[in-house]
Design a protein with these regions (language model features):
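An acidic/histidine-cluster motif and surrounding catalytic segment
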Residues: 1-115, 124-168
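Residues within the DNA-recognition helix of helix-turn-helix
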Residues: 118
Length: 168
């Protein structure tokens, strides 16, 4: 898995270093059986940049927490031994740490947990998951929670981030 994390936000979002975001992304892609040569970029940006992206692509004003920009149409694998998974560029997940920080403060949990949650959320969108309908939302948010909790459990951690966060 090729995962690149770029911090162009001008912030150092502690205690969630870029390496932990990359490790989480690899975990999510591995758990969902995405081709091992798939490529993903996670970019942290400032509010001005996120506002510009949000307006350009969603026609909505102001910054948001996470946006996903799919490239090649990759889907989760089924886990069959003989399955022929597609390889390619999954896409980009763009995070805004200052928005994540405000959301984390309102929700009463750490900004690092919020960034992990938003990264998981963004990757699921790249893989075709959505939350426009109640059944889709339940499926996506249950999977999001499971992926995040299994990642943190492997590290001997828990999260205070609510699984419902990251509704973008």
């Amino acid at each position: 898995m090729s995962v690149e994390v770029l911090n162009e936000s001008g912030e150092v979002p502690s205690p969630c270093p870029e390496q932990e975001l990359a490790d989480l992304a690899r975990h999510v892609l591995d758990q969902l059986r995405v081709h091992p040569r798939a490529e993903l970029t996670v970019t942290l940006v400032d509010e001005r940049t996120m506002s510009s992206l949000h307006e350009r692509w969603m026609d909505l004003p102001g910054p948001t927490d996470v946006m996903s920009f799919p490239m090649d149409e990759l889907r989760p694998g089924r886990g069959d031994a003989d399955e022929d998974l597609a390889e390619g560029v999954l896409g980009d997940v763009v995070l805004c740490p200052s928005v994540a920080r405000a959301q984390a403060a309102r929700a009463g949990h750490a900004v690092g947990d919020e960034l992990l949650l938003l990264t998981t959320h963004g990757i699921l969108h790249l893989l075709g998951f959505d939350h426009a309908e109640p059944a889709e939302e339940r499926e996506m948010f249950d999977l999001q929670r499971t992926l995040l909790l299994t990642f943190l459990a492997q590290r001997g951690r828990t999260t205070t981030a609510a699984p419902e966060a990251g509704r973008t």
